[in-house]
């Protein structure tokens, strides 16, 4: 596993760290969220020519783009350093005929690094200012920002038909 600053972290250390970062969570609360980062074959080619190059590029993307954007989308003034996460890169996908299949599984703690703030990317609140829940999480914005960050980091020239906005519009209708 890897996190923001380290590589080659043992599975037992990951389990212990996530399991101990649960202060004030209810028994019904999730201890962590599993996030899957799965580039297309074209995106993988932009990340490097070998599996090793692609894996290093994926770690760089997770650390420099995805986790910082994830943190920002809580609208709580968080940075990537506040997010407790571990990533594991895989090169195979069951049921896939693609030549390139690298993807990354992220385990993200429900609590921040200090074990004080509850974080949920599944909340439906978006940047609310009043009521019980202030802040929220904007999943659409996360996908847009992560995609733009990918394109900039790897100098990737995305076709409109490959974009999140395009697929989201096809799936859900109107762009407004």
Segments from the language model and where they lie:
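N-terminal nicking endonuclease/strand-transfer module with a His-rich metal-binding environment
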Residues: 1-176
């Amino acid at each position: 596993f890897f996190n923001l600053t380290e590589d080659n972290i043992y599975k037992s250390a990951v389990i212990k760290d996530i399991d101990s970062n649960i202060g004030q969570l209810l028994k019904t609360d999730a201890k962590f969220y599993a996030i899957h980062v799965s580039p297309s074959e074209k995106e993988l080619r932009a990340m490097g020519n070998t599996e090793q190059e692609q894996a290093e590029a994926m770690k760089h993307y997770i650390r420099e783009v995805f986790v910082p954007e994830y943190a920002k989308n809580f609208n709580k003034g968080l940075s990537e350093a506040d997010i407790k996460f571990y990533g594991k890169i895989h090169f195979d996908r069951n049921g896939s005929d693609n030549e390139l299949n690298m993807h990354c599984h992220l385990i993200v703690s429900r609590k921040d690094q200090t074990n004080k703030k509850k974080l949920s990317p599944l909340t439906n609140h978006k940047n609310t200012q009043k009521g019980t829940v202030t802040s929220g999480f904007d999943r659409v914005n996360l996908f847009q920002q992560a995609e733009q960050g990918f394109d900039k980091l790897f100098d990737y020239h995305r076709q409109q038909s490959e974009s999140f906005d395009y697929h989201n519009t096809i799936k859900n209708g109107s762009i407004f």
